């Protein structure tokens, strides 16, 4: 089935990581986030994939070697407008729409492809924070955004299997927030067809930096543990650890997987890497450095005697020797972070720093 993957947005809640990189291209288990979505779609039955691009579109276009098509959304005016941008690439047949910044479990996604018309649902304890599905038996009758009194615990995952006729239903008006919403198209589909809810066993919306950590905690254990780089006989690697070609793991290094060491990365000597960690291509982790449960992106250097925990470091960051990241609240509360001016609960007891691209610290920074 033909599939539209939405990847045009900048992802402002993921800033400053997205200052130079579109959110769907952030790294998850050694690959861009959106690549996981495309691969899962193909596995589920996608025969033609159209990726809608916008912000920093060249980065996405240059990455994909698999046969996909691209459609450009000139202005980011909402999900409905994004799909409208892709219609010229579609035949007059049913189609699936997926968010390029979300992870879906493959078995549930296959069920969505087989069930359509359908919408992916996910059961949560706080539905008032999401778009919530209205249901009547085994049919979806509509969706309501962030209701004070949710009609159910089933939220909208942003995964849709639409009938062919929905290509003509994209002329909806703007919502109160000034965007063309795909949920308005879903509402019309519910009125015109029997739309079924497909319950997803696992789903993750990767919208904020700590959710990038969660995405890697999900996907890193699925890797095959290939070790094609140079690993010293005096290093100890335990669990699922990928070492890409050109990477060097020096004497005295201990890596407790799941972990991913990217192409041409350098680790050690005597460094300690543990807990769902990515060290991207061309990264350097120096002598006696500990990196725990973190994403360290391309070209970043962490100087000797440093500690990085539960953090996300953007591209080409330089941490001076002795830089120490705090990541724990001792009152046992979860960490709260300011996102676009609002204090947001990460629901994580440990969360460190989010460091934008090209940032530098001096020695002994904490």
Task: List the model feature ranges, each with a label.
Residues 2-5, 13, 26-27, 31-99, ...:
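Conserved N-terminal catalytic core of the sugar/cofactor nucleotidyltransferase
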Residues 9, 101, 123, 208:
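Active-site glycine-centered loops adjacent to acidic/histidine catalytic or metal-binding residues
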Residues 11-15, 128:
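Short N-terminal binding/cap micro-motifs at the start of the first secondary-structure element
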Residues 24, 67-69, 139, 194-196:
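Conserved beta-strand segments of alpha/beta enzyme cores
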Residues 95, 158-159, 204:
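A residue-level structural signature of the nucleotidyltransferase/glycosyltransferase Rossmann-like core
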Residues 104-177:
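Conserved core of the sugar-phosphate nucleotidyltransferase
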Residues 176, 188-275:
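Extended, small-residue-rich solenoid/repeat segments and analogous flexible loops
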Residues 218-220, 255-261, 267-361, 365:
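Flexible, glycine/small-residue-enriched loop-and-beta-strand segment within the central core
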């Amino acid at each position: 089935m033909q599939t539209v993957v939405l990847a045009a947005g900048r992802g402002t809640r993921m800033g400053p990581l997205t200052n130079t990189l579109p959110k769907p291209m952030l790294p998850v288990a050694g690959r861009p986030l959106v690549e996981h979505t495309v691969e899962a779609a193909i596995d589920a039955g996608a025969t033609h994939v159209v990726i809608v691009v916008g912000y920093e579109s060249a980065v996405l276009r240059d990455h994909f070697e698999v046969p996909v098509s691209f459609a450009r959304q000139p202005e980011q005016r909402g999900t409905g407008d994004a799909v409208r941008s892709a219609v010229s690439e579609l035949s007059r047949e049913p189609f699936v729409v997926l968010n390029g910044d979300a992870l879906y479990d493959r078995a549930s996604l296959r069920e969505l492809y087989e069930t359509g018309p359908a919408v992916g649902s996910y059961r949560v304890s706080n539905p008032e924070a999401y778009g919530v599905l209205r249901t009547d038996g085994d049919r979806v009758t509509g969706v309501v955004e962030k209701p004070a009194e949710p009609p159910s615990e089933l939220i909208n995952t942003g995964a849709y299997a639409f009938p062919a006729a929905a290509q003509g239903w994209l002329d909806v008006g703007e919502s109160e927030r000034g965007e063309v919403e795909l949920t308005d198209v879903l509402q019309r589909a519910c009125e015109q067809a029997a739309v079924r809810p497909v319950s997803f066993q696992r789903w993750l919306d990767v919208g904020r930096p700590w959710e990038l950590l969660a995405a890697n905690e999900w996907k890193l254990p699925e890797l095959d543990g290939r070790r094609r780089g140079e690993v010293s006989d005096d290093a100890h690697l335990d669990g699922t650890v990928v070492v890409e070609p050109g990477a060097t793991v020096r004497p005295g290094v201990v890596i407790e997987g799941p972990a991913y060491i990217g192409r041409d990365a350098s680790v050690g000597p005597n460094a300690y890497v543990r807990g769902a960690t990515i060290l991207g291509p061309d990264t350097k982790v120096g002598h006696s450095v500990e990196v725990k449960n973190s994403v360290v992106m391309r070209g970043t250097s962490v100087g000797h005697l440093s500690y990085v925990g539960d953090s996300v470091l953007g591209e080409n960051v330089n941490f001076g020797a002795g830089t120490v990241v705090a990541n724990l609240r001792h009152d046992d509360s979860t960490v709260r972070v300011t996102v676009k001016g609002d204090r947001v609960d990460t629901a994580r007891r440990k969360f460190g720093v989010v460091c934008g691209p090209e940032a530098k610290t001096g020695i002994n920074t904490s």
